[in-house]
């Protein structure tokens, strides 16, 4: 699949097929990484994952522009989650300057698709980036999710954080 992805990428004629091959490659290499007794294949899988990593962001942007939030979320999630894998903890995968925007998009897309645990994880990741632009909205969304889940202790914690950061806001 990876070779097919590279072929389509180099031709540049069928973008949808290219990203389909990219996601297939990602999923297959992740199966290798997660498989038991994978030591003889792990190096190759890691190299391929490292090579396809920047294209995951491009896939997220592409499907976002195509108004396909579920597919965009798949690519964004892969882009966000891959550097957190144990396999890559000893190295820094380069994060694009759009990283925070992609994390926020993924969080909102997950929220809209009612994938609340994923949404919470990505809203928290956005807060961890230190980017100010959408922080207030992250707290609002997290509050709504915890309220919907009836997790009142978590909701109270988020509201306390939000009020400490935005003491004069009427949103909390």
Language-model-detected regions and their locations in the chain:
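Mid-chain, structured segments of secreted extracytoplasmic proteins
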Residues: 1-33
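Single-residue signature of alpha-solenoid repeat helices
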Residues: 18, 22-25, 72, 119, ...
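Alpha-solenoid helical repeat scaffolds
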Residues: 23, 27-30, 77, 84, ...
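Conserved structural position within tetratricopeptide repeats
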Residues: 31-34, 81, 127-128, 160-165
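Extended amphipathic alpha-helical coiled-coil/heptad-repeat regions
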Residues: 142-172
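Helix-capping and short linker residues that terminate individual alpha-solenoid repeat units
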Residues: 34-37, 84-87, 91, 131-132, ...
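Amphipathic alpha-helical repeat scaffolds of TPR domains
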Residues: 1-10, 39, 43-67, 73-82, ...
């Amino acid at each position: 699949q990876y070779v097919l992805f590279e072929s389509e990428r180099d031709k540049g004629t069928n973008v949808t097929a290219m990203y389909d091959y990219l996601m297939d490659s990602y999923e297959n290499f992740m199966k290798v990484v997660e498989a038991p007794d994978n030591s003889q294949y792990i190096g190759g899988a890691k190299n391929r994952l490292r090579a396809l990593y920047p294209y995951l962001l491009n896939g997220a942007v592409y499907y976002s522009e195509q108004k396909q939030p579920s597919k965009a979320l798949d690519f964004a999630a892969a882009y966000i989650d891959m550097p957190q894998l144990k396999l890559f903890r000893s190295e820094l995968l380069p994060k694009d300057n759009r990283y925070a925007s992609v994390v926020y998009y993924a969080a909102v897309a997950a929220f809209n698709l009612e994938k609340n645990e994923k949404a919470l994880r990505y809203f928290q990741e956005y807060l961890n980036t230190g980017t100010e632009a959408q922080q207030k909205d992250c707290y609002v969304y997290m509050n709504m999710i915890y309220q919907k889940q009836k997790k009142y202790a978590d909701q109270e914690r988020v509201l306390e954080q939000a009020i400490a950061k935005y003491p004069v806001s009427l949103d909390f």
